């Protein structure tokens, strides 16, 4: 699955080089050396179908493409809104189990808990001292999230994107897989790196976005909005841990329209098109192949077909999650080892930052 145009260009160049080397050359995947990928996910809430197709599948693939891949469970970000401490502790372990079950491999990537690496917050403070207040107040996500909180939102929520920038820059990350709703935050990351470099000399690379080719999975109950962990309608979101019976029920109740034919027309038939997009993503088929193979089915039967495809996709993952959650010591060890590896990378970067800023 193509993730961004630069990758396509690299693959073409490798192919050309292989042709010139003669019949002994191979086209085996090669990892990008000297480049670092970073991404993070909040531990709160259960991963849903949209998270999996829009982010986690890409994370798994990136492990095979880059030498250094760093994934963080960003617990500090999660406390920008109120959390129950006991629930949060369990959620961190649960998210670790989910990521491992989905294919995140600690032998191929670094998986760690954000709060265990103090360089994140230390660098965040330095970057906070470089950004103007209006810059943060004009970010779309701040406006949307602050509107949902009492008293206009917290300072932590406002400076969330600066901590996000520190997460990325403290590893000198070169690439960041992001969704469409994070593009504005990536612009802030690049601006902060650029500002730091202009003030203290060239130090941080300007991270590039890796945009997934998977469009946002829509709510099953309202295809005009994206699928969300926090949707109050329990039938709107398919969670990765849902039982087969729950998945069938949710797809059976999914909103489509009064036309029975299965077509892919996102602008005029959002509900059915969402079903087709999900079906294509979990089956590995193209949208066109899915539509052709579904000819003759009405939407009621088609929704059950999509449900079966999702159940088949999630069955081994769900089984592995249940197994991993039984061994909390193993999950804690994964995070402990990952945090040590992450700190080993972040510490020398921040030591250099301190020298440049003059706070050694």
Curated annotation (Swiss-Prot):
GO cellular component term of the entry, any: mitochondrion
Keyword Repressor tagged: no
E.C. numbers: 6.1.1.2
Source domain of life: Eukaryota
A GO biological-process term: positive regulation of angiogenesis
Gene3D superfamilies in the record: HUPs, Tyrosyl-Transfer RNA Synthetase
Top EC class, one word: ligase
UniProt catalytic activity: tRNA(Trp) + L-tryptophan + ATP = L-tryptophyl-tRNA(Trp) + AMP + diphosphate + H(+)
Binding residues for L-tryptophan: 167
Keyword Nuclease included in the entry's annotation: no
PROSITE patterns: AA_TRNA_LIGASE_I (PS00178)
Main location: mitochondrion
Compartments in which it is found: Mitochondrion matrix; Mitochondrion
Disulphide-bridged cysteine pairs: none
UniProt xrefs under Pfam families: tRNA-synt_1b
Keywords, in A-Z order: Aminoacyl-tRNA synthetase, ATP-binding, Ligase, Mitochondrion, Nucleotide-binding, Protein biosynthesis, Transit peptide
MF GO annotations: ATP binding; tryptophan-tRNA ligase activity
Family: Belongs to the class-I aminoacyl-tRNA synthetase family.
Summary of the function given for this chain in its UniProt record: Catalyzes the attachment of tryptophan to tRNA(Trp) in a two-step reaction: tryptophan is first activated by ATP to form Trp-AMP and then transferred to the acceptor end of tRNA(Trp).
Name of the protein described by the UniProt record: Tryptophan--tRNA ligase, mitochondrial
Organism in which the protein naturally occurs: Mus musculus (Mouse)
């Amino acid at each position: 699955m193509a993730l961004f145009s630069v990758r396509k260009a690299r693959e073409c160049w490798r192919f050309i080089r292989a042709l010139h080397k003669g019949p002994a050359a191979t086209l085996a995947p090669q990892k990008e050396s000297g480049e670092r990928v970073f991404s993070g996910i909040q531990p709160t809430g259960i991963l849903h179908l949209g998270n999996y197709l829009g982010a986690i599948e890409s994370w798994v693939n990136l492990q095979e493409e880059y030498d250094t891949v760093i994934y963080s469970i960003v617990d500090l970000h999660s406390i920008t809104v109120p959390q129950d401490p006991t629930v949060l502790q369990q959620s961190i372990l649960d998210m670790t189990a989910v990521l491992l079950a989905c294919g995140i491999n600690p032998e191929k990537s670094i998986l760690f808990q954000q709060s265990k690496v103090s360089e994140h917050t230390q660098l965040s403070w330095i970057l906070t001292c470089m950004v103007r207040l209006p810059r943060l107040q004009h970010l779309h996500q701040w406006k949307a999230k602050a509107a949902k909180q009492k008293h206009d939102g917290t300072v932590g929520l406002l400076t969330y994107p600066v901590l996000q920038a520190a997460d990325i820059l403290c590893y000198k990350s070169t690439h960041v897989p992001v969704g469409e709703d994070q593009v504005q935050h990536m612009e802030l990351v690049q601006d902060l790196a650029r500002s730091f470099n202009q003030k203290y000399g060239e130090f941080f690379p300007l991270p590039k976005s890796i945009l997934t080719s998977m469009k946002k999975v829509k709510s099953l109950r309202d295809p005009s909005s994206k699928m969300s962990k926090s949707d109050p309608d329990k039938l709107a979101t398919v969670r990765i841990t849902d039982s087969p019976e729950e998945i069938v029920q949710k797809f059976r109740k999914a909103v489509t329209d009064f036309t029975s034919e299965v077509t892919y027309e996102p602008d005029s038939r959002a509900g059915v098109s969402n079903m087709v997009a999900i079906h294509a993503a979990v089956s590995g088929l193209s949208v066109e192949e899915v539509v052709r193979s579904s000819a003759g089915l009405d939407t009621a039967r088609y929704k059950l077909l999509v449900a079966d495809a999702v159940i088949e996709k999630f069955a081994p993952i769900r089984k592995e999650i249940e197994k991993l959650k039984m061994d909390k010591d193993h999950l804690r060890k994964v995070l402990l080892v990952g945090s040590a590896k992450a700190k080993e990378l972040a510490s020398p970067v921040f030591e250099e930052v301190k020298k440049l800023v003059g706070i050694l």
